[in-house]
Amino acid sequence: MHELSIATAIVEQAGEIARADGAGDVSSVTVRVGELAGVVPDALHFAFEVARDGTALAAARLVVEQVPAQAWCGECAEEFAVGMPPFFWCPRCDRPSQELRSGRELEITGVET
C-alpha cells in the first residue's frame, strides 16, 4: 500500500508548512489527486489517519480533491476526458492524443491551522 508512504509525506510536509508559518496544530490538509496518479482516495484517507498519530496533525482531517484526467487533441483542438482505464483517442476526430493536460496531480494545496 504505497498510500501510506504518500500519507507520511503529506503529514511531514504539512507539518513543515505549519511550523514555517509559526502555527501549532493543523486542522486540515487539502490535496489534489489526479485520476491517473495511481492513488486510491479511500486508502489515502485510511493511511493519513495512521500517519498523523502523534504529530501536530493528530486531529487534522484530509480533504481530497479529485482531478479528472483530460487530454488535448492537437489535430482538432478538442479537450476531452480520458477516463479510467485511460483512453487517449479523440472522440471528435478519432485520432490518438499525445498530450495529457490533467490527471497526474498529487499536491498539497492547503494547510489550515
Tell what function each PLM region has.
Residues M1, A77-E78:
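Intrinsically disordered, low-complexity, mixed-charge
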Residues E79-F80, S97:
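Cys/His-rich microdomains that often coordinate metals
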Residues R92-T113:
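Short microdomains enriched in Cys/His and/or Lys/Arg
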Residues E65-V67, E75-C76:
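STAS-like cytosolic regulatory interaction modules
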Residues M1-V63:
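Long, charged N-terminal interaction/targeting segments
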Residues C73-C76, C90-C93:
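Short cysteine-rich clusters marking metal-coordination/redox-active sites
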Residues Q66-A69, P86, R104:
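Short metal-coordination and nucleic-acid-contact micro-motifs, chiefly zinc-binding Cys/His arrays
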